[in-house]
Design a protein with these regions (language model features):
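Beta-rich carbohydrate-recognition modules and glycan-binding surfaces
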Residues: 1-203
Length: 203
């Protein structure tokens, strides 16, 4: 994973989440204790990583979670653009980019009042011929209020990891309704052993 913004990972350097020339207001808020970006008055917003451009050459997909209270039925659209500045880091030379448009008919579909997880193969950004010097993430569209979380690039198929790098999700079922064998979230019943002498595994 190469993370731009997520409590689940260590983020790379992002110089700004809203440049002086874009048309949006952005603030850091918490939703149920989780850090989240809140965009209001959104026309288009530019996040820039120009000090240390992002190398996503080994990644295969882009992820973003979004939530909006605004209408998402046609003709509303939400757009995501990735821009690579090239080896010289100059916007005016060697730049490649591509924009993806999402609406209420795409997969996944835009929705109102619900988190939508976007997992977009980088191969769909067909105009993005370079991925080693990604310097801009641009979002735009008709939803003018958008919550954004978990913005990262990742390698599908596990990306070569041999063990998890984040904990399993915390259970949400009330303890009164649970009999737990093993969980930090509940009081466990007695389990004599997790691997018997006659099984065939290492523990």
């Amino acid at each position: 994973v190469v993370s731009m913004f997520s409590n689940a990972y260590t983020d790379v350097l992002v110089d700004t989440w809203s440049t002086g020339f874009d048309q949006a207001d952005v603030e850091d808020v918490q939703v149920a204790g989780d850090d989240t970006k809140l965009y209001t008055n959104l026309v288009f917003s530019v996040a820039e990583a120009t000090t240390q451009p992002i190398d996503a050459s080994q990644m295969t997909a882009f992820h973003m979670d979004i939530w909006t209270p605004d209408p998402t039925a046609a003709p509303a659209v939400f757009k995501i653009k990735l821009v690579d500045f090239g080896p010289d880091g100059d916007f005016n030379t060697g730049t490649s980019e591509h924009e993806i448009t999402l609406d209420d008919t795409t997969t996944p579909a835009m929705a109102t009042g619900a988190w939508v997880s976007l997992d977009i193969p980088l191969s769909e950004f067909t105009g993005l011929t370079g991925r080693t010097n990604l310097a801009q993430l641009i979002i735009s569209g008709d939803p003018n209020t958008v919550y954004v979380d978990n913005v990262y690039f990742y390698a599908e198929g596990g990306g070569g990891l041999t063990e998890p790098d984040v904990a399993a999700p915390t259970p949400t079922v009330p303890e009164a309704d649970v009999i737990s064998l093993f969980s930090d979230a509940y009081t466990d019943v007695l389990v004599d052993r997790w691997s018997t002498d006659w099984d065939n595994t290492e523990f």
